[in-house]
């Protein structure tokens, strides 16, 4: 590792005799990982943990995940990502690098980012995957936190997610929020809501029939948030959600992930051992 990070995690998963094992678990600085054995399907399940409770101004973090051929892993954050105020104007950054080999399957279920008053944050995620691999990837951002409980008091938030299949860029999504320069309540931004989440699913098993069936499934639920599903140019879809609370949004995310798990892979619903999972 040539660059020094304030927190660094590297997880590697392999298939051994039909069972996925973690062959690499490295942690450094403020970052830690914790295993959980609650998944009824025997899928390795890891929490990403920040020992400081949040990201401090100017800090840089790296998460690297490698899923080898035929392996299946589930990775999530223990809590939302708190980005503390940046009084000196320095940028806080996190980079995530994911590699998925042939017929591998990763469920990366990150909680939303909560930017504090005056914070500046840049998050990048690059996923390199084989065309036969399966991916569920979620993240999000809220209206933030301030002592006065006023929304959108942070200065800068940028999130760039890119997916490559066989070295070709097939998906690129960027969220850029500068509340001092933008009206966060108008059409095209938060539109009066306080929480935004997105979910990307890529799999050779996702086609237009699956997307329509998922849409119908979600419409049959009693949901509090607004959402929209779009098919990708490749075999996949993207779900975007605006909601009153992060818990409302996560309910939709988990419903989508469970539908994919059950319909495509014959797996039981997610059990992430988080408070809002039991609501």
From Swiss-Prot:
Main location: cytoplasm
InterPro entries in the record: UreD (IPR002669)
CC per GO annotation: cytoplasm
Compartment(s) of residence: Cytoplasm
UniProt keyword terms in alphabetical order: Chaperone, Cytoplasm, Nickel insertion
GO molecular function: nickel cation binding
Superkingdom: Bacteria
Family: Belongs to the UreD family.
PANTHER family, per database record: UREASE ACCESSORY PROTEIN D (PTHR33643:SF1)
Subunit structure comment from the entry: UreD, UreF and UreG form a complex that acts as a GTP-hydrolysis-dependent molecular chaperone, activating the urease apoprotein by helping to assemble the nickel containing metallocenter of UreC. The UreE protein probably delivers the nickel.
Purpose of the protein: Required for maturation of urease via the functional incorporation of the urease nickel metallocenter.
Alphabetical list of HAMAP family matching this protein: UreD
Protein name: Urease accessory protein UreD
Biological source species: Streptococcus thermophilus (strain CNRZ 1066)
